[in-house]
Amino acid sequence: MGEKIGVIGAGSWGTTLANLLAKKGLDVTLWAYEPELVAEMRATRVNTLFLPGTELAAGLAFTNSLEEAAAGKDVLVLVSPSQVMRSVLTQLAPLLKPGVTLVNASKGIELDTLMTMDQVCGAVLPPAVAGRFCVLSGPSFAREVAQEMPTAVVAASADLEAAAQVQRLFTAPYFRVYTNSDVVGVEIGGALKNVIALAAGISDGLGLGHNTRAALITRGLAEMNRLGRAMGADPATFAGLAGMGDLVLTCTGDLSRNRTVGMKLGQGMRLAEILGEMRMVAEGVKTAESAWRLASQMGVDMPITEKVYQVLYEDKPARQAVLELMTRDPKAERG
């Protein structure tokens, strides 16, 4: 008998992943916070709020009961925003059976503690559960995966058996999964690419051109690499799907929420106004603060992240931030 799978979070990505698994004939239950959304998905087989236009698999079950979604499950996919992950895990802890595989598909750094999601998991859950933690990350817009456009991602875990299990479950003709053991690197790549996407969006909103965006992506990758190495990551990870791959997609794609927020900032809108218009979470807004604080604490030079933080939280004019980046003291490219 196959694994029973719960997916926690019915936003665009959670719904897409649940549907991918259910289309393979797997036993999948999708949890949504909103009872009315659960009722709608049961009645129409469509998540019109977060994934309109995609028909959901006939075998996919829906619930707003965490117990129903999590109790007795062999695999639990976590797709809640990173800033509420601790709260969600705390509620899930008494429901989880020993040996369950946890798959984190959220990207961020906890603001209060500056922990990555695997660190939050280790702090909240007993070792028997936290040890089978896997991160699923890479360049993957939900809408394109839902439309079965070819996509490649990474499943990273210190437990190679867990990574292989996640690879097997999620692999589909249009969804290729590679394994990796560098959890820290994959988590940092997924979190920081959203911050650099804000910078790329600001640049686009200011009309600064392709040269500027390319410079931000490349130097943003250097910042990702520096912080990752300081935290014990393998630098090679950042040349892969969870690093450069996700960074390029999020900094250039029109479906990128973080790039969209940045563009509107560059065009002169206020952050509160932008966020008030959004239905889904742009993780980079909170991650900009947590990443900048983490870099400061660890003594890591991250000037782009610093300027994004200042534009978001200190009302620094976007053009001034760009000028300050361009007039920093000259230095060697590496180092």
Curated annotation (Swiss-Prot):
The keyword Lipid metabolism applies. Belongs to the NAD-dependent glycerol-3-phosphate dehydrogenase family. Its EC number is 1.1.1.94. GO terms for molecular function: glycerol-3-phosphate dehydrogenase [NAD(P)+] activity; NAD binding. The lineage of its organism: Bacteria, Pseudomonadati, Thermodesulfobacteriota, Desulfuromonadia, Geobacterales. The keyword Metal-binding does not apply. Disulfide bonds: none annotated. This is Glycerol-3-phosphate dehydrogenase [NAD(P)+]. One of its GO terms (biological process) is glycerol-3-phosphate biosynthetic process. The active site is at residue 193. Sn-glycerol 3-phosphate binds at residues 107, 138, 140, 193, 246, 256-258. SUPFAM superfamilies: 6-phosphogluconate dehydrogenase C-terminal domain-like, NAD(P)-binding Rossmann-fold domains.
